[in-house]
């Protein structure tokens, strides 16, 4: 693969976002065959795919253990056997297993077809907004252009903004050319109470049984709502929510945004695909997901916590429901532009994961394929901890000739990492091509994402775990 062609999506290259991403988009509905990626080749039952992925991951891990005997002896001689075994397990063995499982899953993945319904159900869109005067008009513009035949109710939920969010949103609603099947209004709650409270109030005001949530700075592709609904109606009947694919909108703003573009385009997208294939999508993210009202009410709505979307998602899973994933239902969001904003966001995500474990730990013991991914998330805490406290100092030591931690064998995970990045790039590029989107060049962002992004992200994740475990005051840190 030519590395010069590796790139991430961009929707702000000298044009208005709306004109740019709609290029090549059909005005009419696609047939099920054209609108869904079904894949070709030999059909394999899902349990067999799961078994094959597990077998490959176990075999790769066994090979890694065999190759690491000398490394283990050297590190144990310099420290002790227990430390050496724990360090190498979380530096090499476990990441190797994860990469091998992810790689084999991506190779085996075939998106199930969507069924186009005869009629589309009415849908309420909840737009959570706090100090979004700069972005809310674009968000509403994207909603006004939705190619959706059913009725749409748009509720802008102003959570006590201190800027002109209400005025800008109200003016946009009055000026935009909404279709006859679309209604829109602003609910101004006056006081900032948190995103969960605003969404729960919006749910009580909503008139329809399908509830879509987006953030006040998100931009939804023209067929985004339609494809989310089609996926929800096409998936098994126990599916009560579907997560859309969220990508980066402001990738040209600075170097940090360019790196995050790859995180969304590759990292997050590959994990969502993996979980979705095994009926185990763990998070219907608040930035762009659709829910059935019944499931929201049975789960008690959005909980008052910093990670309300993941805790709600796990509550839905605990009710024995399923969450799906629509890889071609696209929305674009503005990511943090400063190190401080990025750190606060990822700390919030890490706290949300710990909140979900504390609230819904029985999910760890369900007899489902998706239980593997719950345990996968359990491993994040020691993985991030060892990476931050052991591997990063080991990299510094390697610069002075001490290779006990970061030695030649640590590169054993690189072949799998390169392979799955190449595969997910090809998959994602195919999605964008079918959607009429441009994949722009972003080599420098990719190199930073591949070589140094973890050095920034993992310590922040550890920070989030610690403050949640120690019970520090909860605060919604905005972007």
Predicted features by range, described:
Residues 137, 163-172, 223:
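Acidic helix N-cap motif at the loop->helix transition within catalytic regions
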Residues 141-151:
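Short, acidic, metal-binding catalytic loop of nucleotide-sugar glycosyltransferases
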Residues 66-93, 102, 106-108, 117, ...:
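Membrane-embedded multi-pass helical conduit in multi-pass membrane proteins
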